[in-house]
């Protein structure tokens, strides 16, 4: 398993970008699931 992380294709830009975007989307989704009011807070006048 650890040898997988040392391979050249795993450190390439598309793979790193895909993992980064997936983690960011997951964090945003989970944050909005637990604190949904902050999603619409700036829109309330």
Curated annotation (Swiss-Prot):
It is a single-pass membrane protein. GO terms for cellular component: photosystem I; plasma membrane-derived thylakoid membrane. The chain crosses the membrane at residues 9-29. The keyword Secreted does not apply. SUPFAM superfamilies: Subunit IX of photosystem I reaction centre, PsaJ (SSF81544). Pfam families: PSI_PsaJ. Signal peptide: none annotated. May help in the organization of the PsaE and PsaF subunits. This is Photosystem I reaction center subunit IX 1. The keyword Oxidoreductase does not apply. The gene is psaJ1. Belongs to the PsaJ family.
């Amino acid at each position: 398993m650890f040898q997988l992380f040392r391979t050249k294709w795993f450190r390439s830009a598309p793979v790193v970008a895909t993992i980064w975007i997936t983690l960011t989307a997951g964090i945003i989704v989970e944050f909005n699931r637990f604190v949904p009011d902050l999603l619409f807070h700036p829109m309330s006048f």
